[in-house]
Amino acid sequence: MADLTLCAFLTKVLCAHGGRMFLQDLRGHVELSEAKLRAVLRRAGPERFLLQEVELRDGPWDAEAEVAAGEGAGAGSGGGATACRVMAVSSARLCARYQRGECQGCDQLHLCRRHMLGKCPHRDCWSTCSLSHDIHTPINVQVLKSRGLFGLNEGQLRILLLQNDPCLFPEVCQMYNKGVDVLYGYCSLKDRCNKFHVCKSFVRGECPFQPCKRSHQLIHAATLKLLEDQELSVSSVVNFQIISVYRHKKLHKMLEEKDHSASTEQPQGLGKQGALGAVEARPFLPARAQSPRKPQ
């Protein structure tokens, strides 16, 4: 089985099991050794499969502990057994302009956002909705094929998007993201606010700050209550948090390397030019003409 076909199948299996599985469990669906399966996943890269060594925990499932393990806080820190966890990652996104009726065709999915959240008022009579509920339209088929996702059914695609696409994340409080107050920003509702008090740039995968004064924690007591009230999937938000933390670390590392490269290139350039070169690099500025003095 070619890697592309195999990766499509592995994504399908992962999304059929909530978007993440332990490597050993995933191996039960393919006739490959653990070493060969791990090699396939690594070749595909973290833009397709995120692999993490996490500590195995006893007892009931705990969302906050799951996030902590995904961030590396639990991997081996307690001295217990560890296992490799695999998460399905994708660049597939819903087209935001299509939601507003402004796009006829692009490289993103043209699907009703509310339908993918299971909240479209027209879900029982989808033909009355102005937005598509069909993942198999020509545009959507082309997008899915280009990303190796064509074999997914609607439920599996929903799982994949919920843990990757910021468009499907619950509404973030815009007022919280303004102002100098670290705890509430400009949000006057404070603890009574029914929107997420998290960094909107982090959710979008664009936050350049490390550390950031806004919260990057999507899973805690207050947000768990919001998720429960809005009947949203805690498991999908846990996955979204783990993938977002990875993306934030990757972005921060890239920015650090860019800053380091810029700081080292400038002295090297001046060193090669020497003093004369440094002078020649300056723009030529004509001397200011002096006005003649009046006779005494």
Curated annotation (Swiss-Prot):
Gene3D superfamilies: Winged helix-like DNA-binding domain superfamily/Winged helix DNA-binding domain
Keywords for this protein: Acetylation, Metal-binding, Repeat, Zinc, Zinc-finger
InterPro entries noted in UniProt: WH-like_DNA-bd_sf (IPR036388), ZAP_HTH (IPR041360), Zc3hav1-like (IPR026693), Znf_CCCH (IPR000571)
Highest taxon in the source lineage: Eukaryota
This protein's record includes keyword Cell inner membrane: no
One example GO MF annotation: zinc ion binding
Keyword RNA-binding: no
Signal peptide: none
N-acetylalanine: residues carrying this PTM: 2
GO cellular component terms listed in the entry, alphabetical order: cytosol
Chain ranges of zinc fingers (C3H1-type): 111-136, 198-219
Full protein name: Zinc finger CCCH-type antiviral protein 1-like
Species per Swiss-Prot/TrEMBL record: Mus musculus
